[in-house]
Amino acid sequence: SLMQGDSARALDPIFRATANEILFAHRSFQWDTEASDGAAVYCVIVGFSFAPGPGARRLFDYDKAKGDPREQAARRINCYLIDTELPGPAKRSTPLLAGLPAMSKGSQPTDKGNLLVKLEQYDEVAADPIAATYLAPWAQSAAILDNEKKWCLWLVDSTAQDREESPILAKRLAAVAETRKESPTPSVKAAARTPWLFTQLRQPTSRWLAIPRHSSEHRICVPMMELGPETIAGDALAYIENCPAWVFVYLQSAAFTDWIRTFSGALESRFRISPDRSSPVTWCSDR
């Protein structure tokens, strides 16, 4: 991840200021291990030097994660491991192009699953007449990529009486409170006092475009889906509220896919989109 996203963006000016240059680099490949239960580890190899002399740089690419490297000559390699003298895109707090709609990250429950309802749990929760009124469809990346069906207990407008009188709600909220009390994060620990609320609330109030934050690098484009405000956006999704048709068309283009392939981060080798709007064209840069 050092040569991806914000890390590469931060490293590039340091290299330039100290007259260091990358002499050779192996782009992302899967590290082989003899362990039977070894985790899938993706890595890069980078060699650099202070004030190197002239001459070609060496860049190694991999058509397959476990394949053999393919070498190409490069004039200069930047911190995104691209053959160019140009730096990566600068971090921005707003889009470079005026009028682009904002991309946001969905809501985060921090609940150890107690505010979420799986398909096999639905009938039990729905049988509680109070809890049933707070059931809402819950969408994460799996809902878009794999058609996963899941719900959440959306209790933003709930009453204290409902939370106390419902056996389902009382049990689940007590578990949420205990989970948050054990967190080392001060804001999560403080949220134990309001276990019925997600720790991060970012729910659209009108129709929204759901964008999985993680997606296979083998896809031509990232699958997306338009949903209504009755569906709760989870934190594994990014979303654009009232997304214009032309923006959707761009997000489904090869240009957008190439952009995130080059400048976004990765989870193993999969794309990882962040809605920090830090790229010069659109929103997809930091991981």
Can you annotate each of these PLM segments?
Residues 1-129, 146-147, 160-164, 222, ...:
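Signature of N6-adenine DNA methyltransferases within the class I
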